[in-house]
Structures are given as structure tokens and as C-alpha cells.
A protein has these predicted regions:
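Bacterial N-terminal signal peptides that target proteins for export
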Residues: 6, 61, 69-84
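Long, compositionally biased low-complexity repeat segments characteristic
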Residues: 2-31, 38, 53, 164-181, ...
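Acidic, glycine-centered low-complexity repeats within long intrinsically disordered regions
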Residues: 15, 21, 26, 32, ...
Length: 523
């Protein structure tokens, strides 16, 4: 043999070469066979003496295929070898095809346009919906990914395909069994939960089977929203029940209603008069008290067999302890970290997808319409009165930043806010002296508090004598909202139009046609 060139050679015009497109270098060995570089135009020649399973081969690929020499001890070997390679090629092709399907499933999708929410990305794919929740504490990264798949056999097939694409050779059935056992859902093998999946930026990814029909809800605003969406029967467990001013939930808990008849009627009135909500209807299924949201009763949660947990995330929380190991989808309700009132309200669309509430889009559309109409109305009024919010808590006075949701609400009400020039989107931790110095000339002082008897000016001075330096205190222009009696948080979290109306009334007392205050009352 002459000089052997170091190059790659294709399997010529043989059928096997066309099927595979594989390259074999001069140093390649396939089943102990070495390919020489002395190929003829008619095909590929194998060098002699190469031993394959103890047999010498001197064959040439031609139009007629593979020919054995007389020295071959097993005349059927070439056919066997060809079939073996063909089987290998077909296996690779099928695997490649399957991977292609999985890749295409993720690559192809339609992104739903969201007008206000900055922390949500929703992409509709064939057979599933991908939802990425942005990390509000680490801009540009994903906090949690959700893969929403409808329940049923077809959904199971989609879940298996996506899991194989993410986890490679993971035993999907075994993962499903482990998930079922961790939930205590005997005999239930529904593919849902984390199952070891990871999303963008290494975040947790959960498969959520929709509609969610059973959930543990850790916050009162989301309980109220589910009632408005007609999904109240999906609430099977709650945390911090004593703070939930929803009469029907207290009944389903088997407790005396925490919300008085006054608060219940004011809640219903707020929603119906806004034109964007509907009165809550009662549900028949009982609700379990799962303890504190900071230390939930894990055993009670397991006993519920919930399909999801709705939890508000916190910065540097370090995860959710034992809840992380239950393999139950944890819906991190980061809506409260949106920096615009309508941005938080637009999360209604996400919750509508989770619970398959057909009214979600129309509910948000009504909220948006009412909010923008009120904003336009306020813009036509003269600049409003100046407003100071909240009060001293210990040694700190927390005030909304100028770019926060509350700061934007005050701006849209055309009110004068003493920290309007601030660039923060969260709360400002200020000393009482700083606030008094900045806001001594404010016209209106409006704050919230929880529990106890209605406050008086004398009680406020006992709390902090510096309040008397405020002009609003001196003139008696003080407004309070007792959130132990008034369903403030349950209502306004996803209904910013109601709170906007309140602030327009407070800062523009001369405005007509806005009705009476629903949450704040003059001290």
C-alpha cells in the first residue's frame, strides 16, 4: 500500500453510506475492522488481513453490495453485519427524530403580549403553555418556570415528552411514582410537580396540570381573586386564616366569620360598584386551616392532596423548607412585586390559566378600563391636595417610594405626594423625624392599621408626640383604615381602580360623581 493519506472518507455510493452519511477516518475501527485509504471508484475496499470475529474479509463495495472471500468461514456474516449497522443507524435516526420533536416543542411558540406586567412571560406552545416568573430581586433572571399542561392522557404524553427532553434518560414512570408517594396520593401517577426539572438560570421548573381543582392558598388576596374567578371550590386549605376577611372562607373553616357584616357588605359594595368585579358566591367544600404561612402545617397540607400551593415569595427566603420536598407545584405569587398597579392586576391572566377561569381576561379588561377612565378624569382636575401615607412603626416610618405601586397610584390620582421625586419602587425606611420634616405641611394624612379599637388623635399622640407637627393632624384631616375590619388587602390588591378612586376623593374633595369612600374613614 502506498502512502496512506490522513483524510475522512464517506461510504461512497453504497446504500449503507447513503443511509448513514457517516465518516470513517483512516484510523477508525468498527468492530475491529480497519478501513484503508486505498478505495476504488467502485466503492470502499477493506484491507487484508483484518479479523472480524476470527474471519478474514477481502470484500469490495460495488453495485452488487458486499462480497465475501473464499477464506470466510461464515458466508452469512456480511448480511448479518449489514443488518446490525442498519439497526444501529435506524436507532440513531429515531432518537434524533424524537429529540427534534422535543426541541421543536420548546422552540416554537406564541408569546402572549402583556401590557403592564414586567415579571411574567407567557408562551403558548403546541400542547402546553410555558410561564416564566421573573426574579424581582435579581433583574434579568427567572425565579420560577411553570409548564402548564391540560389533564388527561394526551397531556400525560406531552409531559413525558417534555421530561425526556429535559432529563434525558430519566425514568419518567419512576419519577411519577416517587412524586405520587411523596404527596401521599395513593395510586395517582399524574405527571406533575418538579420531578427534578430545572428551568432558565437553574431555577426550579414545575409541571402544573390544569385546571387546578385543589389548592392550598397562603394569602388572602389570592383567595378573594379565586372567588371572583368562580374557582372558590379549588381553595381546600389556607394559611393565616384569622387575617382572611372573607365570610364564606370562615364558614368553610368551621369558624365564626372574622369579617363583620359591615366589612362583608363594604367588600361586596366595593367590587360591584367598581363595575369590574362580581359578588363572591359561597362554596360547599370544607377548607383546612394549614397554620401560619411562615410555618405551615406540612402534615395537613399533605393530607389535602393539593395540586398546587399559592405562596408569596420573599427575598433571601432560602426556599420553602419541607414544602420543597413534597413535589407539589409551588406557585410563587410574586405579583405584589410588580411596580405598577395594572402590572399586578394583569397577573389575573396567569391565575386564570392555572385554574382555567374563562372570565380572567374580561375581568382584567374591565379593571383596566375603569382605572384608565379614572386616571383621565383626575388629570382634568386641578392639582390635588398633598397626601402623607402610613404612620410610625417602632422606630421606622415606612413610606412608599416615588416609583412604587402606591406612588404611581397617587400620581395617577393627580395628588401631590411628598416623595413623588423619589426613584425607588419599594418602601422607604425613614425615621419619623425625616418624614415630619418633609411632610409637616401635608393636607391629608391617610394610613392603615390592624386590630383594636378605632384610633383617636389622643391615642396617636400617646404613640408619638411628633404627630402634632403635621398640619393634617392640626386640621383634623386624618383618615384611617382598620384592615382587621375592612377587607382592604383582599380587595385592592387586584383592583387598583378602587384604591385610585379613594385617592382621587381624598385629594380632590370638590370632584363630583365619585361616590363615598369605601375603605378610609375620617377620624
Amino acid at each position: 500500500m502506498n502512502n496512506v493519506l490522513e483524510k475522512d472518507i464517506y461510504l461512497g455510493s453504497s446504500a449503507l453510506g447513503q443511509a448513514t452519511g457517516m465518516k470513517f477516518s483512516d484510523s477508525d475501527r468498527v468492530s475491529g475492522m480497519k478501513f484503508s485509504d486505498s478505495d476504488k471508484a467502485s466503492g470502499l475496499k477493506k484491507s487484508v488481513p483484518n479479523v472480524v470475529f476470527g474471519m478474514k474479509i477481502s470484500a469490495a463495495y460495488g453495485a452488487g453490495g458486499l462480497k465475501s472471500s473464499a477464506a470466510s468461514k461464515h458466508s452469512g456474516f456480511p448480511l448479518f453485519f449489514g443488518l446490525l449497522v442498519l439497526w444501529f443507524v435506524l436507532s440513531l435516526s429515531l432518537s434524533s427524530c424524537q429529540c427534534g420533536k422535543q426541541s421543536a416543542a420548546w422552540d416554537e411558540g406564541d408569546t402572549i403580549r402583556l401590557k403592564y406586567a414586567q415579571l411574567l412571560t407567557i408562551v403558548e406552545h403546541e400542547g402546553f403553555t410555558e410561564v416564566n416568573v421573573g426574579n424581582p430581586w435579581k433583574k434579568g433572571t427567572v425565579l420560577h418556570q411553570y409548564i402548564l399542561i391540560k389533564k388527561g392522557k394526551k397531556g400525560d404524553e406531552t409531559a413525558e415528552m417534555l421530561m425526556k427532553g429535559r432529563n434525558g434518560s430519566q425514568d419518567v414512570a419512576g419519577a411519577s411514582q416517587a412524586m405520587a408517594e411523596s404527596q401521599g396520593a395513593a395510586g395517582s401517577h399524574t405527571l406533575a410537580g418538579s420531578l427534578g426539572l430545572t428551568g432558565p438560570d437553574g431555577c426550579r421548573a414545575d409541571i402544573v396540570r390544569t385546571p387546578i381543582c385543589s389548592s392550598a392558598v397562603f394569602t388572602s388576596p389570592h383567595c378573594q381573586l379565586l372567588y371572583e374567578l368562580g374557582c372558590q371550590n379549588a381553595i381546600r386549605g389556607v394559611c393565616d386564616s384569622k387575617y382572611i376577611l372573607i365570610e364564606d372562607i370562615q364558614k368553610r373553616l368551621g369558624k365564626p366569620a372574622a369579617a363583620s357584616s359591615e366589612s362583608g357588605s363594604r367588600q361586596s359594595s366595593a367590587l360591584s360598584e367598581s363595575g369590574s368585579g362580581k359578588s363572591s358566591t359561597s362554596a360547599s367544600l370544607p377548607i383546612a386551616d394549614c397554620g401560619s404561612s411562615m410555618q405551615p402545617d406540612v402534615e395537613k397540607i399533605i393530607a389535602l392532596h393539593p395540586e398546587a400551593l399559592l405562596i408569596s415569595p420573599f427575598e433571601n427566603s432560602g426556599g420553602y423548607g419541607k414544602l420543597d420536598n413534597l413535589n407539589i407545584p409551588i406557585i410563587e405569587a410574586a405579583d405584589y412585586m410588580e411596580t405598577s398597579p395594572l402590572g399586578r392586576a394583569e397577573w389575573i391572566k396567569f391565575y386564570g390559566l392555572l385554574f382555567e377561569a374563562n372570565t380572567a381576561d374580561s375581568l382584567f379588561a374591565a379593571i383596566e378600563k375603569e382605572y384608565l377612565a379614572l386616571k383621565t378624569q383626575a388629570a382634568k382636575l386641578p392639582k390635588g391636595l398633598s397626601i402623607l401615607t402610613e404612620r410610625k412603626m417602632g422606630s421606622v416610618w415606612y413610606s412608599p417610594g416615588g416609583k412604587s405601586t402606591m406612588g404611581i397610584l397617587l400620581k395617577d390620582a393627580n395628588a401631590r405626594y411628598i416623595f413623588a421625586d423619589d426613584e425607588h419602587s419599594g418602601s422607604l425606611s425613614l425615621s419619623p423625624e425625616q418624614v415630619i420634616a418633609r411632610g409637616s405641611e401635608v393636607d391629608v394624612w391617610a394610613f392603615k392599621y390592624f386590630g383594636g379599637q378605632p384610633l383617636s388623635r389622643a391615642a396617636l399622640l400617646q404613640e408619638y408626640d411628633g404627630y402634632k407637627a403635621l398640619r393634617a393632624f392640626q386640621t383634623g384631616n386624618i383618615y384611617e383604615c382598620n384592615t382587621d375590619r375592612i377587607p382592604y388587602f383582599e380587595t385592592v390588591s387586584f383592583h387598583p381602580e378602587i384604591l385610585l378612586r379613594e385617592f382621587i376623593i381624598l385629594s380632590h374633595p370638590q370632584a363630583k360623581g365619585l361616590g363615598a369612600l369605601r375603605f378610609y374613614r375620617k377620624m
